[in-house]
């Protein structure tokens, strides 16, 4: 197994939260959950796009819809699928794995969110495609 480096990054969440970037060989995984990413903070968005840069997979807190994340759930410490797409596209990441789903969401709701997220990614794409999936119990991702 190649040597691995781990980089931690402070995120926006009550009580603090850290994202982690795991790099080993030519592979990179970023874990960024329990974090509220905001479009209104350009310096922060740029900083996270750099943190996500060229990741093979970004495991991303997508608890809320964009509408909820910027209105009724603002400052609750969680993000949306749309923000995940925007950051990953800017970063040149290859796979966005939506994680930390709203506990009240049914499987059908999560499937619809994935479908909508894929469509959004498709219509906003300016570079290489970003694969979108939803995390589930016991999921394994081959790098």
What are these model-predicted stretches?
Residues 1-45, 50-51, 139-143:
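Core dinuclear metal-dependent hydrolase active-site scaffold
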Residues 28, 36-131:
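Cap/insert and terminal regions of metallo-dependent hydrolase folds
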Residues 127-143:
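Class I S-adenosyl-L-methionine
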């Amino acid at each position: 197994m190649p040597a691995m480096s781990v980089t931690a990054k402070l995120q926006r969440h009550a009580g603090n939260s850290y994202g982690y970037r795991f790099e080993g060989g030519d592979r990179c995984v970023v874990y960024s959950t329990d974090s509220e990413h905001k479009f209104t903070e350009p310096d922060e968005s740029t900083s996270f796009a750099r943190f996500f840069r060229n990741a093979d997979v970004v495991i991303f807190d997508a608890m809320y819809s964009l509408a909820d994340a910027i209105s009724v759930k603002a400052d609750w410490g969680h993000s949306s699928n749309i923000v995940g797409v925007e950051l990953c596209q800017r970063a040149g990441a290859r796979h966005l794995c939506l994680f930390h789903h709203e506990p009240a969401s049914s499987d059908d709701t999560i499937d619809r969110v994935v479908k909508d997220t894929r469509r959004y990614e498709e219509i906003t794409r300016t570079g290489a495609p970003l694969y979108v999936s939803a995390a589930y119990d016991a999921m394994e991702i081959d790098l």
